[in-house]
UniProtKB/Swiss-Prot annotation:
Compartmental location: Secreted
UniProt keyword Transmembrane present: no
Range of residues in the leader sequence: 1-22
Protein name, as recorded: Mesencephalic astrocyte-derived neurotrophic factor homolog
GO (cellular component) term, any one: endoplasmic reticulum
Entry keyword set: Developmental protein, Disulfide bond, Secreted, Signal
Presence of the UniProt keyword Secreted in the record: yes
Annotated organism of origin: Drosophila persimilis
Family: Belongs to the ARMET family.
Disulphide bond pairs: 28-114, 31-103, 61-72, 148-151
Length: 173
């Protein structure tokens, strides 16, 4: 009787440990979102063949930018990629493994895959520009493909952003 209770308790604890160790979306957001988007773009005819999945992933990577492009580089989906662990993604996808599990396997092979993070968007309607760093102010202008010629001081960048704000900032209704 005591042995069965002990076995049940151990099984329960193992299950709890397994769910707490599972990869969460915020722990590996770029990988999970990219793998989900890629898997959703695949035709049913391709989903079972890992070689075709790899070919499609290389095509998919040619259109990616920023963090997704870096993710493709890490996996070996780009011509200039130094390493290639593409089969660590394509084979599990061919078995219909969920994106979280695929990224968990990829993280074991290359931890930097889960170091990729999307940059947090700044809400220009509620943020106090004076409290932002100059680097963040420059990033706002860069995201808008705008420049600030002659800007030296923080106040110069703030003034330029305020001038352009009506053109780029979305107002909530």
């Amino acid at each position: 009787m005591k042995t069965t209770h002990l076995v049940l308790v151990l099984c329960f604890l193992a299950g709890v440990a397994q769910t707490t160790l599972a990869l969460k979306e915020e722990d590996c957001e770029v990988c999970i979102k990219t793998v989900r988007r890629f898997a959703a773009s695949l035709d049913d005819a391709i989903k079972g063949d890992y070689k075709q999945i790899e070919t499609e992933f290389k095509k998919f990577c040619k259109t990616q930018k920023n963090k997704e492009h870096r993710f493709c580089y890490y996996l070996g989906g780009l011509e200039e990629s130094a390493t290639g662990i593409l089969n660590e993604m394509s084979k599990p996808l061919s078995w219909s493994m969920p994106a979280e599990k695929v990224c968990e396997k990829l993280k074991k092979k290359d931890a930097q895959i889960c170091d990729l993070r999307y940059e947090k968007q700044i809400d220009l309607n509620s943020v106090d520009l004076k409290k932002l760093k100059v680097r963040d102010l420059k990033k706002i202008l860069n995201d808008w493909d705008e420049s600030c010629d002659g800007c030296l001081e923080k106040s110069d960048f703030i003034k330029r952003i305020e001038e352009l704000k009506p053109k780029y900032a979305r107002s909530e209704l």
